[in-house]
Amino acid sequence: MSKRKITDPYNEKFEPFNNYGTPIPGMSWHKITYNQKTGEGTYILKMDPGAKSRYHEHTNFEEFIILDGELIDYDNNVFKKGDIVTYEPGSKHSSYTKKGCLILTFMRGINKPSEIK
């Protein structure tokens, strides 16, 4: 017998996004397989209009797919519905959204808060 879980990203219960300890206003998540201790796994991230992520560094690869809305990176690149984005280890950035967005995120390591330089 298989162990299977089906996730509907539009109808799941979301909790405040607290991956850095303190919840970030306007950001919430639904963990699918994500392990906060190892930073590995998958989660759905919801950002309300006007939400902004903390500036952080990727210790390993992170990939995500924009399921809905759009996300604007610190360098003003705009990621739209259907875009698949990859951040390599050592990448540093923050992102924000004007309209709100829903993102399916695949993590391979813990992101750590960083200073803007």
Regions found by a protein language model. Give the residues of each.
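Conserved short histidine dyad/triad with adjacent acidic residue
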Residues: 28-58, 88-92
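Short glycine/proline-enriched turns and hinge-like loops at secondary-structure junctions
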Residues: 57-59, 77-78, 97-99
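Ligand-binding loop in jelly-roll beta-barrel domains
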Residues: 89-114
